Amino acid sequence: MKHPDFLDNRDFTGEDKKRPSTLHMDTSYKALEGDVKRLSEAASTRHDPRYLQEYIKTGINMAQSDASDHDFTVLIRAGREMYRANCVFAPYRHIRKVSIFGSARIRHDEPAYETAREFAREANEHGYMVITGGGPGIMQAANEGAGEERSFGLNITLPYEQTSNHVVANSNKLINFYYFFVRKLNFVAESDAMVAFPGGFGTMDEVFETLTLIQTGKATIYPIVLLDSPGKTFWLNWLAFIRVELVDSGLISEDDLHLIHVTKNPAEAIDHIDRFYRIFHSYRFIGDT
């Protein structure tokens, strides 16, 4: 299974990544302009040199500004993390992927663990690779279900709690991130669907941010499935809260709930994703050219 061609040109902003940036930042040190242009043209053997030119000029502008050394560190480290992630994902961009979220604290003997493993196994059989946070709990269950060859792990380096699970620990598809925002960007940019299991603040953060990005047109629309285990009501209770406190209060539209599919059946979850891609091809915003 592969991306439709139009999906290969997307990024997390919803814009065409092949379209050169309209941003033009003239450096305050004009003598460098020609050098930057020549360097960009010489180095850009596979891309429009204007991309590199703007990147270098941004750095020069920062070097001549009141930016702190820490500001530079963030820029450099975030850029390097994006580059490393791109190197890992690039060979697999023709394959659809499902991001799977859920608590790192779910134990092996809990129903949600087996449900996550079963769903990932189903996803693999339907041609999808899986992307997880690379840690324990639901993440490990999903990586076990898909297997190392069909799994990505986007691990976050923390002072406590999270370490890479045994499935992806030695995989060339394990990516370690220092910054949450870069990690989250890659989850959204590289996924064709999202499946969330019961979880805490981190899982809620991923669900709400993905909903926000799709609702506001900052990410390409794709299926969001909230998957419970048989007999459990975690997501039904969550959805009831959303209806009462957000929809009934007029804080969101009833139509926004159409972005979400709640189920307790792994087979139904993957069928929902398959059905979406049998029907969906593309969409446009009014006034977009």
List each language-model region with its residue ranges.
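Solvent-exposed alpha-helices and their adjacent loops that cap or buttress functional pockets
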Residues: A90-R93, E122, A146, H166-A169, ...
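Short, acidic/small-residue loops that bind anionic groups at enzyme active sites
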Residues: F152-Q162, F197, L211-W238, E254
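Short glycine-rich anion-binding loops that position phosphate/pyrophosphate groups of nucleotides
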Residues: S103-I106, P159, G199-G202
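Short acidic, glycine/serine/threonine-rich loops at helix termini
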Residues: A142-G145, S164-H166, E206-E209, L236-A240
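Active-site/ligand-binding-proximal alpha/beta "capping" segment
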Residues: N176-L227, R275-S282
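C-terminal functional extensions of proteins
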Residues: F6, L226-T289
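Acidic/glycine-enriched connector segments
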Residues: A116, G137-F197
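Glycine-rich beta-alpha loop segments
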Residues: H3-I156
